Amino acid sequence: MLNLFAAFKKDRIWDFDGGIHPPEMKTQSSGVPLRTAPLPDKFIIPLQQHLGPEGELCVKVGDTVLKGQPLTVGRGRTVPVHAPTSGTISAITPHITAHPSGLAELCVIIQPDGEDRWCERAPVADYRQLTASELIQRIHQAGIAGLGGAGFPTASKLQGGMNGVETLILNAAECEPYITADDRLMQEHADQVIEGTQILRHLLQPKVTLIGIEDNKPEAIAALKLALRGQPGIALRVIPTKYPSGGAKQLTKILIGKEVPHGKHSSAIGVLMQNVGTAFAIKRAIVDGEPLIERVVTLTGEALSLPGNLWARIGTPVQHLLKFAGFQPQAQQMVVMGGPLMGFTLPALHVPIVKISNCILAPSVSEMAPQEQEQSCIRCGLCVDACPAGLLPQQLYWFSRGEEHEKARNHNLFDCIECGACAFVCPSNIPLVQYYRQEKAEIKAIDLEAARTAEAKARYEAKLARLEREKLAREERHKKAAVKLTDGDQDAVQAALARVRSKNAVPATGTISGDAPDNSEMNAAREARKAQARERRAQQETPVAPVTASASEDEDPRKAAVAAALARVKAKKAAPQATAVETPAESPAVVTEEDPRKAAVAAALARVKAKKAAQQATAVETPAESPAVVTEEDPRKAAVAAALARVKAKKAAQQATAVETPAESPAVVTEEDPRKAAVAAAIARAKAKRAAQSLTTADTDKE
C-alpha cells in the first residue's frame, strides 16, 4: 500500500489491453463557448431516464407546474423527474423516446408559459453542516443520475459506497470522438466541478481522490489546475488519449493499476467513480437547491452550420436543438444520439433530450458513410486485439448468431462494455455491437422468465405448505378438543342407543301385530268355507226331519248357548295370554294399543268355533221328538269344554310366565311383548284346535 501511494505521488499511470485510436473530430465544437438553447413549443419528459424503474406520477393533465417542480416521486433506484420550465401539463401519454428500439414510453407533455418561474428552492450555505444521509436524500430528490452515459442513480451508488471506499475517481476522460460536453463544462465551470467533488469527498471520506483527463484537452486541464489551487486531497492525472480510456474498468486500471474482477463493479476493489458532469449537478443540487433539469449537449457534425455545446433543458425535442444549430439535412441524412462508436441512430427527430444525452451528431454523407454491406467473418482476429475487456468478440459473434445463450454467457458476454472497438476494426463490416446487444436482451428476457417461473413455483409450494400447516393445526385442535368420556357420558350414550333401538323396533312390532289379524281373517274365511262344505255333506248323509217355525225358534237358544260357551272358553284362554304379555298396570297405554287387535282375533276365532259347534250340534242332535235329551247333554259338553279350556289356559299361562322377564325391568318387557305375544297367540291357537278335535272325538265315543 505504501508503494502504491508513492506511485500516486510520482504521477504514475498504467495502461490497459486493447483499445483503438480513431479520429477525434473534437475541434468542431470544443472551441465554441457554451450557449443556452431557447425554450421549445413543448417539452416531452419521459418518466424513466435512468437505470431503474420509473417513478409514480404526482401530477395530472391540466395542472400548472413551476420550474423545478417534481413530476414523479420514488425511492431507492427510482429517480424523480422535474418540470424544466413553468407551464401547463397538456398530456400524459406514451411517446417515442431516445432508445435504439424506438419504442414509446410514458411521457409528460408540458406547454411552457414563457415565464420560466422557479418553484421554491432550498439552497445550503454550508454543506458540511449536513449529515451524510441528508446529503444523499437531497441528491436523490434532485433526480441526479449518472451523466456519463450509464444513467445509474447517483444516490443509490453513493449509498452503496458509504463503507469501504478508498479511492474516489472523477472521470474527465471523455474519450469518444466528436463529444466535447465535459471538455467545455470543465473549461467554463471548473470551480463548480471541484466544489461538487469536495461534496463527494465530504460524503464518502475516501483516502485518495483522483481526476483522470485525457491529454487532448489542454484548456480543460489548465482550468482544473487553476481550480485545484488550495484544494488539498485532490490529484489531477493526465492520461494518454486512447479509446475507450473513459470506461470505468479501463480508467480504474489506468489510474491505480487494479483490474475489476469479472462480473463485478469498481466498488469491489474500493473504488467509486463519478462523471464530472455528475459532480457539477451535485454542486447545484446541494449548494443552489436546483434539481437536474438541464445539461450540456454537444451538437456537432458537418450537417450543422453552428456546431457547439448548448445548455439544453431535459425534454427538449432534438429537432428544436438541430434547428437552433443550423441543421442542413442532406440525402440519406442520419442523426446519431451519442458518439459514432457507442451511439445509435435516432428513429425520429422529435425524440426528447434526456439525462444521459451528451451528444447529437449530424454528419454529412462524406463524413460518415452509411453502413456498408455485412460480409462473412474471415477470422482475422483484429477484434480480439482491439477488445479492451479481454474478450473473444469473434466467438461471441458466432454464439449470438446461433442463439447459443449459455455459451455466450460462459464466454463473459456481459463483460462487454459495448465500446464498438471491435466493430471499428472489423474488415467485414460486421456490426458486432448490435449482435451483442441483441444477445444480451434475449438472455435477460430468458432470465426474467425463469425468475418469474421460480417465483410462481415458490408461491405454489408456499401455498401447499400453508395448507398442510392448517391441516395439522386443525387435527391438533381436534385432538385437544377430544376428551375422555366419563361415566355420565357413557350413560348418555347408552340411553341414546336405547332410543335408537326402540325406534327401530317400532316398525317391526307394527308389522307383526298388523299381520296377525290379516292372517287370522284369511284362516277364518278358509275355515268357514270348510265348515260349509262339511255341513253340506252332513245334510246329504243325515235325514233332516221337518222342523217347524217354533222348533227353529227353539233351536236358536241352544246354538246361542253353545256359541256363548265357546266364546267364554276363548275369552278365558285369551285372558291369561294377555296377562302374560301385557306390561304392568303402570303402563296402561300399551294394553290399550294391543286390545283392539286381540279382540278382533278372538272374535274371528269365536265365529269359526261357533260355526263348528253348530255343525257338530246339528250332526249329533236327535230328532225333534226328543229335545229334552239334547238339552240335557249340552251342559255336560259345555262343562267338559270349559274344563279343557281351563287346563290349556293354565299351561299357556305357565309357558308365558317362564319366558317373560322379571317385573323389575318393565322397559325390557315392553320391548319384547309384541313378539312374545305373537308366539303365544300362535301356540294358543294350536292348542285350542287340538282341544276342539279331542272334544269332538270324545263326544262321538260317548254317543
Swiss-Prot record:
BP GO terms, sorted: electron transport chain
Obligatory cofactor(s): [4Fe-4S] cluster
Topological category with respect to the lipid bilayer: Peripheral membrane protein
PROSITE patterns, per database record: 4FE4S_FER_1, 4FE4S_FER_2
Binding-site residues for [4Fe-4S] cluster 1, renumbered to this chain: C377, C380, C383, C426
Protein localization: Cell inner membrane
EC nos: 7.-.-.-
Annotated GO MF terms: 4 iron, 4 sulfur cluster binding; electron transfer activity; metal ion binding
Keywords: 4Fe-4S, Cell inner membrane, Cell membrane, Electron transport, Iron, Iron-sulfur, Membrane, Metal-binding, Repeat, Translocase, Transport
Cofactor: record remark: Binds 2 [4Fe-4S] clusters per subunit.
Biased composition (Basic and acidic residues): 524-539
Gene Ontology, cellular component aspect: plasma membrane
Pfam families (UniProt xref): Complex1_51K, Fer4_7, RnfC_N, SLBB
Transmembrane parts of this sequence: none
Stretch list, region Disordered: 505-558, 653-674
Residue stretches making up the 4Fe-4S ferredoxin-type domain: 368-397, 407-436
Major subcellular site: membrane
Source species, domain of life: Bacteria
PANTHER family: ION-TRANSLOCATING OXIDOREDUCTASE COMPLEX SUBUNIT C (PTHR43034:SF2)
Family membership: Belongs to the 4Fe4S bacterial-type ferredoxin family. RnfC subfamily.
Subunit structure: The complex is composed of six subunits: RnfA, RnfB, RnfC, RnfD, RnfE and RnfG.
Protein name, UniProt field: Ion-translocating oxidoreductase complex subunit C
Organism of origin: Serratia proteamaculans (strain 568)
